[in-house]
Regions:
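Extended C-terminal regions of large enzymes
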Residues: 1-123
Length: 123
């Protein structure tokens, strides 16, 4: 969710990992004259990410399009602490959807309503 905010702020994602939500909140408040909390900013990011997902759905994205490159699913990691492991996307993706409040790759109507995105419901 923070990544969506960083992208929306027009900042470089590659250099963003040195800062966290509190620092980006201060930057956003200074630039916009707002008084957001880090929690507010993360919710804004969650809203952005869900809107992006609904845009992708409207553009024709299907659940089967939500995948990693075949190499990451079949080639074991060659070295380091994760040596020998491959991605278990078939296990982790449904768990990720559940945590996000999504079903089959897209936000549920309940998630959209919770985020105040009523205009996206049923689309």
């Amino acid at each position: 969710d923070l990544t969506a905010v960083i992208d929306s702020m027009g900042l470089c994602l590659f250099t963003s990992f040195a800062l966290g939500a509190p620092e980006y909140t201060k930057l956003l408040n200074a630039a916009c004259g707002t008084e957001y909390t880090p929690e507010d900013v993360l919710e804004i990011g969650e809203r952005i990410y869900n809107i992006e997902r609904m845009f992708n759905k409207a553009a024709g994205m299907k659940p089967e399009d939500d995948r990693l490159p075949k190499r990451l699913l079949s080639e074991p990691i060659p070295e380091g602490p994760s040596k020998g492991m491959t991605s278990k996307l078939e296990i982790t993706l449904p768990e990720y959807y559940e945590v996000r409040g999504w079903v089959n790759a897209f936000p549920t109507d309940e998630t959209l309503k919770r985020l105040g995105l009523d205009e996206c419901i049923g689309k």
